[in-house]
Amino acid sequence: GIPCAESCVYIPCITAALGCSCKNKVCYRN
């Protein structure tokens, strides 16, 4: 539920390496 300051509209979350996932076009973590 914590925003990772990254969007995933056009490309996947680079922050996925930190445990972030795409939700509502924004990368979130927990």
From Swiss-Prot:
Keyword annotations from UniProtKB, A to Z: Disulfide bond, Plant defense
GO biological process, one term: defense response
PROSITE patterns assigned: CYCLOTIDE (PS51052), CYCLOTIDE_BRACELET (PS60008)
Nucleotide-binding listed as a keyword: no
Annotated crosslink Cyclopeptide (Gly-Asn) location: G1-N30
One Pfam family here: Cyclotide
Coiled-coil residue windows: none
Signal peptide span: none
Disulfide bonds: C4-C20, C8-C22, C13-C27
UniProt similarity note: Belongs to the cyclotide family. Bracelet subfamily.
Task of the protein: Probably participates in a plant defense mechanism.
Name listed for the protein in its UniProt record: Cyclotide mden-G
